[in-house]
Curated annotation (Swiss-Prot):
Its EC number is 1.14.99.60. This is 3-demethoxyubiquinol 3-hydroxylase. The keyword NAD does not apply. Keywords: Cell membrane, Iron, Membrane, Metal-binding, Monooxygenase, Oxidoreductase, Ubiquinone biosynthesis. InterPro entries: COQ7_proteobact (IPR047809), Ferritin-like (IPR012347), Ferritin-like_SF (IPR009078), Ubq_synth_Coq7 (IPR011566). Belongs to the COQ7 family. Catalyzes the hydroxylation of 2-nonaprenyl-3-methyl-6-methoxy-1,4-benzoquinol during ubiquinone biosynthesis. One of its GO terms (biological process) is ubiquinone biosynthetic process. Binds 2 iron ions per subunit. One of its GO terms (molecular function) is 3-demethoxyubiquinol 3-hydroxylase activity.
Amino acid sequence: MSPIDRLILEFDTALRSVVGGANAQRPTPGSEFASNSGVDAAERKHAAGLMRVNHVGEVCAQALYQSQKLVARNSEIQAMLDYSGQEEMDHLAWCENRLQELGSHTSYLNPLWYAGSFAIGLAAGLAGDKWSLGFVAETEKQVESHLESHLKKLPKEDQRSRAIVDQMRIDEIAHGQAAKNAGGVNLPEPIQKIMHAMSKVMTTTAYKI
């Protein structure tokens, strides 16, 4: 693939992340369950808030993976980031479709989330591959944690959303492990705490808007 073709592809990915229209390569988990069977209006609203948070997380993931691929010094690391990024694109599409089924919308602040995450990912990538991969691993660890919390918060009757979140959780564990296996190092605790605090702001805001 030529550099121009690659640039066009990455721009298309960024546009689909921010504006919508992501395409999944894998079937949507939970498709065997009825869309909103047994879920009342209040539960749908709550589930939509949680799935909007998850969608924002995937918007941020796309920005992080794209920016880090740009500055990765190793072709194998670029390939690993590309593979994980495609699975994150599946997550993006699943969450977007589920929000539509729930009669809701993605976050109105997606351009802001994407831009901020791209800048952070670029900075992590410029620090060197081991720190970049460590950042990926820590990010996936924190995402896994909040997905587990969502499985406890989602209505039990919303089997469709729960199936999506559970598969996302499984994938995030694999992505984090792949980053560690590729040479990622543990981040200093202060950085982990800052990441957690920033994540808290994002999840609280995205639940509503």
